[in-house]
Amino acid sequence: MRYGEMEVKNFNPEEIEVWPNRNDRHYTIKITLPEFSCLCPRSGYPDYATVYIEYVPSSLVVELKAIKLYINSFRDRHVSHEDSANEIYDLLYKKLSPKELYLKMDFNPRGNVHTIIEIDSKKN
């Protein structure tokens, strides 16, 4: 097993690395992860998506390599579009306690179906 595969395999989402936010001003962090993949829980076919994360930090920010490893940890999991989006949102909200959090997952069409999942803390 190569080192990247080992990092993804051994990644524990509960230990996602966060750093102190050293800035007091209100600002938005936008992260785009265009290589999300998981497996359909029904068929086993691969699903691909671009993940868009926007958040206004409070006291913590997520370390970028950690979020990359977390997203990559889905690639061999059988998980629905809805469950993957909600799991990512819930983990980030729990770990960061941001002032605002918005997550969008834009899945590539498969079988003539295009799915977009959006979760917004301002609407919950």
UniProtKB/Swiss-Prot annotation:
Subcellular location field: Cytoplasm
Pfam families xrefs: QueF
Major enzyme class: oxidoreductase
UniProt KW keywords: Cytoplasm, NADP, Oxidoreductase, Queuosine biosynthesis
UniProt binding sites for substrate: 62-64, 81-82
Molecular-function GO terms, alphabetical: preQ1 synthase activity
Pathway of action: tRNA modification; tRNA-queuosine biosynthesis
Chief place of localization: cytoplasm
Family, similarity comment: Belongs to the GTP cyclohydrolase I family. QueF type 1 subfamily.
InterPro entries, per the entry: GTP-CH-I_C/QueF, NADPH_dep_7-cyano-7-deazaG_red, QueF, QueF_type1
Organism (species): Wolinella succinogenes (strain ATCC 29543 / DSM 1740 / CCUG 13145 / JCM 31913 / LMG 7466 / NCTC 11488 / FDC 602W)
Active-site positions on this chain: 40, 47
Task performed by this protein: Catalyzes the NADPH-dependent reduction of 7-cyano-7-deazaguanine (preQ0) to 7-aminomethyl-7-deazaguanine (preQ1).
Gene Ontology CC: cytoplasm
Protein name, as recorded: NADPH-dependent 7-cyano-7-deazaguanine reductase
Any single GO BP term: queuosine biosynthetic process
Catalysed reactions, as listed in the record: 7-aminomethyl-7-carbaguanine + 2 NADP(+) = 7-cyano-7-deazaguanine + 2 NADPH + 3 H(+)
Assigned EC number: 1.7.1.13
